[in-house]
């Protein structure tokens, strides 16, 4: 099978095409790519090189927040179109969601981080505690992949595995009233700033 016919290669190509089609990635009349930090020579050079490699057309720069939101949406689409195809490796009822500042879903919505909501309330009520630990513990990813909980019917689908006498604290079991389980979080930063590490898909 040719290397460009495998799922990840095809979806990566589509992802790059969508960056161009939506104008998220473009080069303006001054030769500055939309994901460049215009005040950083290195950022401008790297961003332009990437844009040219992906054959970006010359367009005026879109607003930073608009480009950032578009990048997050396109990145979420890429994850949605690829991760579920790994069901045979990671079985489960998965959700891929783009979070935003206005989203009702926060990191504390998930089982592993539900204690953060409690910690936030404590620091609001106690100035000394707030000064001591600050708010650096808050995790704010742009995109999350999480697993929904399983009903007892799903768990017992092939044979009786659980009942009311066992697994009463298992996070995966819906009957226990827990929260969804966070599997992955993605930070999608559009602008190539010199103080941020760079990763590419």
Task: Outline where the language-model segments fall.
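Conserved catalytic cores of phosphodiester-cleaving nucleases, focusing on short active-site segments
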Residues: 143, 182-188
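Short acidic, S/G/P-rich loop/turn micro-motifs used as interaction or catalytic elements
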Residues: 150-152, 189-195
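Intrinsically disordered, low-complexity acidic Ser/Thr-rich regulatory segments
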Residues: 57-63, 134, 170-184
């Amino acid at each position: 099978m040719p290397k460009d016919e495998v799922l990840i290669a095809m979806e990566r190509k589509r992802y790059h095409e969508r960056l161009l089609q939506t104008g998220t990635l473009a080069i303006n009349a001054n030769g500055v790519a939309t994901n460049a930090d215009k005040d950083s020579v290195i950022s401008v050079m790297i961003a332009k090189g990437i844009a040219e490699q992906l054959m970006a057309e010359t367009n005026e720069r879109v607003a930073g927040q608009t480009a950032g939101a578009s990048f997050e949406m396109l990145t979420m689409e890429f994850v949605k179109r690829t991760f579920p195809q790994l069901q045979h490796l990671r079985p489960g009822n998965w959700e891929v969601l783009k979070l935003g500042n206005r989203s009702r879903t926060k990191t504390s919505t998930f089982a592993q981080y539900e204690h953060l909501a409690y910690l936030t309330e404590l620091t609001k009520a106690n100035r000394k505690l707030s000064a001591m630990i600050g708010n650096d513990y808050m995790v704010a990813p742009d995109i999350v992949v999480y697993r929904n909980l399983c009903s007892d019917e799903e768990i017992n689908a092939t044979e009786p595995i659980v009942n009311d006498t066992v697994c009463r604290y298992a996070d995966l079991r819906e009957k226990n009233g827990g929260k969804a389980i966070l599997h992955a979080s993605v930070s999608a930063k559009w602008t190539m700033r010199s103080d941020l590490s760079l990763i590419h898909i």
